Amino acid sequence: MNNRDYFPDLIGQHAVKKKLSFYLEAFHKTEMCPFLNLIGAKGLGKTEFAKAFAKNLINKDGDKRSFLELNCSTIKNNEQFFEQIFMPLVADNEITILFDECHALPLDLTMAFLTIFNTEKNSRKNFEWNEATFEFNFKKQTFIFATTESDKMFPPLKDRLTTIDFEPYSSEELGEIIKLCTPDVTFADGVIQEIAQTVRNNARSAVKRAKEINLYCGAKEKNTFDELDFIDLSDHVGILPFGISYTEKQILSTLKEGSCTLTGLSAKLGLSKTAVQRDHELYLLNKNLMEIDGKRKITSQGLELCKFFA
């Protein structure tokens, strides 16, 4: 195996890079690639890595393989997939298909995929449906799946795929992403680290922060960015410590007054219990700003943060 860097423009995810690089090397020798399943939280770069992986797949004639990205929530049933997607775009073509948010695949197509991807040594698979035969050629067609909710995937389908797990980014990696996305900006010492502390652990959040910095520098007609600039930007766009949202700030302020049940917290915030649990509590728990022990409670770190808001 050579040491070629197939992902020079992507930061972090070293285990993912090693695994995908191995499969690319194998593909270049065998023309075969396993059915990949990219799993991780929102914003960790699953789609970007899938696109970068696909760019490195070369057809027999030396051209880059075509790439098709599908959001599985838009696929309604077998009929739509085979008649509107597979036959005109996939059949007999050299192409890579990304099934994004694959936990949302319709049930009948999931059942079809159980048959289609139930193969080990063969490079072809014929699938019969609705009195027609559809040929899958796995030397021509590469299939990649991605999801943020692997627990909702049909287990037998998940077993047929090769899992690639993504992990949260470190503050240093988030800082590197911000610098990569702000090539015309020179940062004062220590500012990147301070900015990275306000990014919510994922690459997408870092890219958004970089866009805000680019807009700020463009509006100010400057190409340097220091601590005072970051304070000014934070004031204008509402950047809070740890990158928490104003709703999360409200949760901490509520819990500062005393522990609370989920129902009580939901009522005080005017949000559904599901919204509180899925959209706001998770990040506060991740940052150890609150805890759940029967009731919702603020931690000592959360109390320290509330002093900053006072």
Spans of features found by a protein language model:
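Conserved AAA+ ATPase "SRH/arginine-finger" region at the nucleotide-binding site
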Residues: 148, 162-174
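Walker A/P-loop
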Residues: 25-29, 33-69, 86-88
